[in-house]
């Protein structure tokens, strides 16, 4: 039976299902693929990463997927703690000027790094303005940590093999831009770290990789990151 692998994150995880396939299957052979889906003779990969997505969106998309399907392995790459996402019933899509991410039932508005909109006119901009404190980059951290807890805990409860990380280390943010993504002094005791991996962005910078925008690492760096953490990742094709 094919391995069912699911990835969830923000823009730093877009396209990175190819890196998982390259590291764990040692192949770049032909496969059926779309922007978010890849399938070969041994595995199918679903990449639910969304540019600008925060940790609530990652949690919601995970729960949406688990409602219909139980994968063999999940990798969660959490995003900036400060990001505030929103979801609405899918039937209300006509009320939005932008094109949101959708699931079978919901549409999602990614939090991203929201900039205060002066004289905001659209519903979304007014909602975002009301949801961020522009004098405190840590205003949404506590809610975001609860989202991480919920996502990790449901995978534990369902006994789904998984790993998780945050794209940057919120205790030691490596760049000025990640300092604005939310900083914490320590992790709350209620989050289980047994399947946690180190930050790929911190890995990139510690390895001497140039990260021009202080946020996004490239494919080759993530490939090396997976190889470096391979022994800790609970994805195994030895039985294939």
Which functions belong to the PLM regions below?
Residues 1-57, 61-68, 218, 223:
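Serine-esterase "nucleophile elbow" of acetyl-processing enzymes
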Residues 2, 63-240:
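Alpha-helical cap/lid subdomain in secreted, periplasmic
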């Amino acid at each position: 039976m094919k391995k069912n692998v699911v990835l969830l994150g923000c823009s730093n995880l877009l396209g990175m299902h190819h890196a998982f396939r390259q590291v764990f299957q040692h192949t770049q052979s032909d496969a059926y693929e779309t922007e978010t889906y890849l399938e070969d003779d041994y595995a199918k990969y679903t990449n639910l990463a969304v540019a600008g997505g925060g940790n609530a969106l990652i949690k919601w998309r995970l729960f949406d997927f688990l409602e219909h399907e139980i994968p063999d392995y999940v990798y969660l790459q959490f995003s900036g703690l400060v990001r505030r996402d929103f979801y609405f019933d899918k039937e209300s899509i006509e009320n939005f000027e932008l094109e949101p991410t959708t699931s079978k039932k919901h549409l999602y508005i990614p939090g991203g790094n929201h900039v205060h909109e002066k004289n905001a006119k659209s519903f979304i901009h007014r909602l975002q303005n009301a949801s961020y404190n522009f004098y405190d980059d840590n205003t949404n951290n506590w809610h975001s940590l609860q989202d991480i807890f919920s996502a990790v805990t449901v995978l534990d409860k369902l006994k789904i093999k998984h790993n998780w990380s945050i794209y940057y280390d919120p205790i030691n943010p490596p760049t000025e831009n990640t300092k604005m993504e939310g900083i914490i002094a320590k992790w709350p005791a209620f989050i289980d770290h047994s399947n946690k991996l180190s930050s790929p962005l911190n890995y990139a910078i510690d390895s001497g990789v140039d990260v021009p925008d202080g946020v996004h690492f490239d494919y080759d760096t993530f490939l090396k990151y997976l190889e470096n953490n391979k022994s800790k990742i609970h994805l195994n094709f030895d039985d294939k």
